[in-house]
Structure formats: structure tokens, C-alpha cells
Amino acid sequence: MHLGLLALALVFFSSMGHADNLKASKARRQRRISTEVPPSCSNGCEHCSEYNGCLKCRPRLFILLERNDIRQIGICLAACPVGYYGIRNRDMNKCTQCKIENCEACFSRNFCTKCKEGLYSHRGRCFSSCPEGFTVNGTMECVVQCDLSEWSPWGPCMKKNKTCGFKKGNQTRTREPLQVPSPATSTGAAPASGCVPEIQTQRCTVQKKIPCKGENKKNQQNRGENSKNRGRDSKERGGNKKRKNTNRSTTVPTITTSMVT
């Protein structure tokens, strides 16, 4: 009797194992069929599968692989999201995650463009404070520390590099660096962009129009020629009047012919 019960138990467990194997093989077969027959791809995708999403994006788009448990699902984007940078290849454009320490956004594998909150950006890296010889600006970037002089007086009012012959122009003033940065702070890949002269420009109005030097002689010559022309015109008008009066005083003799009978 015990042997019969044992045999029945073995048959039962073997049938259960066979059923589980059938279910697993059926699931694998359905998964293989779903990958072989491509479903309708999302926007911007050329080749895709139901299990892994997009496999190849259209040209000019980037593929981003998002992890979902043990799977990686591909999606197509026009630009990589924050924390990733784009790599363009002939076969496919990919979004690669930034791996620079304390970096939120990067331009390439070795250059960070935005650090985490409270940190300062310097030459593509993130620091808790700016290096010696540098100071922070309004965008949390370390720039060359540079002291500038006071503003110079406003320059003359000019237009097209001239100080005459106009009514309105521009004038400028500058302030220069008080000292040149040391080589230790100005050498390297990044230029000393913070230590440069500053220039301000404003509109100006000339109270009295100043003629240029050449314009005075030209104006005098023009006035002389105009006076000569006026004198010549007056003489010509006087001669014409005399000739008209002479013509009026001269009488032409008339000849009268009569008949004698």
C-alpha cells in the first residue's frame, strides 16, 4: 500500500513539472515571436521590439537606453536629457550618461558644464571652492581674479572716427586692469577671460555743429563762386534791358507810294 501511494506521488509531481516546462517553453516561444515580428514603432524609431523598445532610431535622433528591472528599453530623442551627452556615430547616435564627479550636465566625457548645487565649475570640473587666483562669477564659474581701475573720463563725441560734421554721435570710456595675472593663473587651456579692459559707450549730442577743416575752404569757395555768378547774372540782365530799350526807340522809315494822274 505504501508503495502504491509513493508511485502515485511520483506520477503527480512529474506531471506538475512537465506542465511547468510546457508553460516556460510556450512563454519563450511567444517572446521569440514578438521579437521576430516587429510591432508598430514609436515616433522616430526605425527598428524596434516589444521586449526592448526601439533598437535603432532615425538619422539625427539619439537613442537613450532606460533600465527597467533587468531590461533596457530604447527611446528616441531629438536631444539628450540633463545628465547625458550625445555621441554621434555613422551607425547610430547615442546618449551617454555623465560620469564626472559631482556633475549634473556635461558637454563630453571630460567636460562638465553644470555642477551640483553648491559647487563651482572650473575648466570642466567641479570644486568646492575656486583655485587660488580665481574668483566666482554670477554663474558659479571660477574666473581669473582681476582688479580694474576707475572709469576714465568720457572721450570726445565722435561719429565714424570724426569729431566734426555731425550733430549726434557716440562717446566711450574705459577702465583697465591694475595688474596682469600671474603665469600660474593665466596659463592652461582656458584663457584669462576675466582680466580684460571694460568699455562703456553712450550716445552724445554736439551743442553746436563743428564744420570740418576742409568744409570751411569749400564753403568759402562756394560762396565766392555764387557771388561771381550773381554778379555775372546781374550784368547780363542789365545788358538785356539796354538792348530792349534801344530796339523800342529806333523807328523804321515808311515809304508811301502815290499815283499821279
Curated annotation (Swiss-Prot):
Residues 1-19 form the signal peptide. Keywords: Disulfide bond, Glycoprotein, Heparin-binding, Repeat, Secreted, Sensory transduction, Signal, Wnt signaling pathway. Disulfide bonds join 41-48, 45-54, 57-76, 80-95, 98-106, 103-112, 115-126, 130-142, 146-195, 157-164, 204-212. GO terms for molecular function: heparin binding; signaling receptor binding. Residues 225-239 have a biased composition (Basic and acidic residues). It is found in: Secreted. Transmembrane segments: none annotated. GO terms for cellular component: cytosol; extracellular space; Golgi apparatus. Residues 181-194, 247-261 have a biased composition (Low complexity). Glycans are attached at residues 137, 161, 170, 247. One of its GO terms (biological process) is positive regulation of Wnt signaling pathway. FU repeats lie at residues 34-86, 92-136. Its main location: secreted. InterPro entries: Furin_repeat, Growth_fac_rcpt_cys_sf, R-spondin, Rspo_Fu-CRD_dom, TSP1_rpt, TSP1_rpt_sf. Residues 145-213 form the TSP type-1 domain. Residues 168-194, 212-261 are annotated as: Disordered. Activator of the canonical Wnt signaling pathway by acting as a ligand for lgr4-6 receptors. Upon binding to lgr4-6 (lgr4, lgr5 or lgr6), lgr4-6 associate with phosphorylated lrp6 and frizzled receptors that are activated by extracellular Wnt receptors, triggering the canonical Wnt signaling pathway to increase expression of target genes. Acts both in the canonical Wnt/beta-catenin-dependent pathway and in non-canonical Wnt signaling pathway. PANTHER family: NEUROHYPOPHYSIAL HORMONES, N-TERMINAL DOMAIN CONTAINING PROTEIN, R-SPONDIN-1. Belongs to the R-spondin family. The FU repeats are required for activation and stabilization of beta-catenin. Binds heparin. This is R-spondin-1. It comes from Danio rerio (Zebrafish).
